[in-house]
Amino acid sequence: MSSKMVISEPGLNWDISPKNGLKTFFSRENYKDHSMAPSLKELRVLSNRRIGENLNASASSVENEPAVSSATQAKEKVKTTIGMVLLPKPRVPYPRFSRFSQREQRSYVDLLVKYAKIPANSKAVGINKNDYLQYLDMKKHVNEEVTEFLKFLQNSAKKCAQDYNMLSDDARLFTEKILRACIEQVKKYSEFYTLHEVTSLMGFFPFRVEMGLKLEKTLLALGSVKYVKTVFPSMPIKLQLSKDDIATIETSEQTAEAMHYDISKDPNAEKLVSRYHPQIALTSQSLFTLLNNHGPTYKEQWEIPVCIQVIPVAGSKPVKVIYINSPLPQKKMTMRERNQIFHEVPLKFMMSKNTSVPVSAVFMDKPEEFISEMDMSCEVNECRKIESLENLYLDFDDDVTELETFGVTTTKVSKSPSPASTSTVPNMTDAPTAPKAGTTTVAPSAPDISANSRSLSQILMEQLQKEKQLVTGMDGGPEECKNKDDQGFESCEKVSNSDKPLIQDSDLKTSDALQLENSQEIETSNKNDMTIDILHADGERPNVLENLDNSKEKTVGSEAAKTEDTVLCSSDTDEECLIIDTECKNNSDGKTAVVGSNLSSRPASPNSSSGQASVGNQTNTACSPEESCVLKKPIKRVYKKFDPVGEILKMQDELLKPISRKVPELPLMNLENSKQPSVSEQLSGPSDSSSWPKSGWPSAFQKPKGRLPYELQDYVEDTSEYLAPQEGNFVYKLFSLQDLLLLVRCSVQRIETRPRSKKRKKIRRQFPVYVLPKVEYQACYGVEALTESELCRLWTESLLHSNSSFYVGHIDAFTSKLFLLEEITSEELKEKLSALKISNLFNILQHILKKLSSLQEGSYLLSHAAEDSSLLIYKASDGKVTRTAYNLYKTHCGLPGVPSSLSVPWVPLDPSLLLPYHIHHGRIPCTFPPKSLDTTTQQKIGGTRMPTRSHRNPVSMETKSSCLPAQQVETEGVAPHKRKIT
């Protein structure tokens, strides 16, 4: 048998591969593609992988495999890679299971992916209301377990406190070189200082004025900036420098010199100071340090050298300039801060492209219209309606003592309710403007003044004037009440007419405006979509004259006399003779003037303040006497039931309560100026009505009057006269903080190209980008939340460059890997900033700058100790050294030590941020693991109940007060069934 088989074997030809027509149906390549066994490369990746590590890296390493001929085979490979995403192993075993079942957790994760970025009070279009309501309902119950889970993490951090002392050898060597080079920079300053003054950070007087930084002008932009790289083939990615990067990296001495480049020795800053004469010149790092003081703990320690110089000015007296240089190295530095210094350099190289553009081409700040969304009428109308409800009356939280303009003539801005307009805001013009988007206004009396949107402070000023004059003004005389029935009601009818705009002239009572014609005739249109007011004498149009001798109005036109039933202010008392109209009194020589006083007019309707929705044809709407007296302008009466002082006190009590108004619509805008010029002064400046819609909202987007002279506002610096940096860029900007001018030297870290606005998507510009490295110790549990200092850093960048977008690079401190790149838009940053007391931060900044302004010429040192509310001001010794002198060199003679603290620097997690294993396994962040599938019935019962019992409240307080993260584990992964056993 065997011999026969041997004889028959040569008949088989094994060299010919089997074929089916022209295509090979079985080959070695097909075998590899269809085989379920892993390839050699996959086996090598699996053998070198850490336990619990995301296998996205393995997918990138297998990209060099032969191309898959079938789409289904490619999907199988993706599923295999994703399927190997393991749940990380906890550092400390979980104490219990979650109250939510696996199905409930997966359902909530799906909803969290959809609606996590949507604000709670937003009116997003295209969302499923039922799902969104379900998400909000589940979120309430999830937050209860999140609180308990954060308490568990805090206790776990105490058990693993040694994790926070971890610092690799490379990181220790790198940070030591940087810190030693920074210590050498300290020797540039004086060695001995004597204590000059001790003051409080907040000052000894409370601040009640909301303030902010207002960008006056971008003076100079030098250097270039690189593009940011935000897309990587796999995550997490190892942060390490390549050979090319190591060759191009700066030395520690160069890095320290760039960090401590004094603005007092900057020739560019000296030239700009001599031209623009700011009181303060500081760096962006010193600005952040002065803002990063959060009470009541004030945990940050810092020392800032200050140089005060007096520079001569041609044709004027010398000017004192305060130079605030960059902060000195810290005396104490945590391991987390050292780790961040080490990881910041490779992250910078990894997220940078090779291409760069001049920094002068970057769209750093918002344009003069400040918001492109104002072109979108539907969104503007909604926002106006909200603003009008919140800003209907005075805001006594604001300091308006400097806003009184008694004896100063102002314009009269009239508004009329229109059923077609949902909500409007009057514009500061010479002629009355109807609250229509398409209103056309012609103002020949002052043609150089165009229509512009009024800011919130102007509206507050005008309303304050009305309240003050209602109480104090007694100059109107009783003669204006003689014809109360026909005059008062007639003017009130004109005001409350729902089909026609109020007809008034708002000319400026200046020396030129006092020579106006005796009669001005105004055209009114009863159309709901368009109203044109023309201030030319025209016999074809109805005219409105006011006789100042008898104060009687004669209205020509049938439409203005038909609104007897729509009168909203129908009170008839003898006290109505109190009419405050100084212009009428001054012009009582027989000349005729236009209707109304010199203050801005208001229609007698509760919906007529700062963009209120119009009344329409509501004829039966009643208005209280208080509202009618506050809102109507043509004739101001004090009613019998109206106690001016009492009502003002009531309004003050109501308005002193917390309101839901957003404080900083734009972080860099100055919401309230304590020394704001009068309305007449503001109208004297140029304004561009063509770039503004006719009805804008009264928010921080309005452009206030600048503090620079017009010749300096339009002056363009010649970059060839200035010294550009060899690497990077310098941007010099001029800001105003109340009555202070600040010259800030900053830089743009990275840029990206994106559409200029939501409406103009085809126009793409370069915008600034700021990347914040964040070293974390709890990646096995989730993503750590931003601390107060990190939020303040992002906020400071938004102050300097209002068009900035932000990225937070979450870095695992144990593996040195970037495991999440979080993008934060400007809108999301505004929501996060609610955790900061921005008004207090500005108050501290202003108090320190005011204190520095009172010092004499010389060199000083600002010193703040950790957890201290006081500020020490040292002055450089003039050769006289005492025992109490502060030796700066001795203090910074060695490397900074590690602060000793009894508590672990733990930071709570952010329950709204999802990691890949959360999405893949359907696990809610910051919650305990669910029970196994074997107890499905019990799980559903326990999950649907969703216990609402409250847990210990001190948990949230502790997590809120803590400011640093917790631990991580190198072996994070564990099989799902093992996770459930724990």
Swiss-Prot record:
Name the predominant localization: nucleus
Phosphothreonine carried by residues: 573
Q: Which Pfam families match?
A: NARG2_C
**Where found?**
Nucleus
- Ranges for the region named Disordered are 410-450, 473-504, 595-623, 672-697, 930-982
Composition skew (Low complexity), residue ranges: 597-610, 684-697
Gene Ontology annotations of biological process type = positive regulation of transcription by RNA polymerase III; snRNA transcription by RNA polymerase II; snRNA transcription by RNA polymerase III
Q: Which domain of life is it from?
A: Eukaryota
Q: Where is the composition biased (Polar residues)?
A: 410-427, 611-623, 672-683, 956-970
Q: Which GO terms describe its cellular component?
A: Cajal body; cytosol; euchromatin; histone locus body; nuclear body; nucleoplasm; transcription elongation factor complex
What is known about the tissue distribution of this protein?
Expressed at low levels in lung and testis.
* Comp. bias regions, Basic and acidic residues: 479-497
- Subunit organization: Component of the little elongation complex (LEC), at least composed of ELL (ELL, ELL2 or ELL3), ZC3H8, ICE1 and ICE2. Interacts with ICE1 (via C-terminus domain). Interacts with ELL.
Question: What name goes with this protein?
Answer: Little elongation complex subunit 2
The species this protein belongs to is: Homo sapiens (Human)
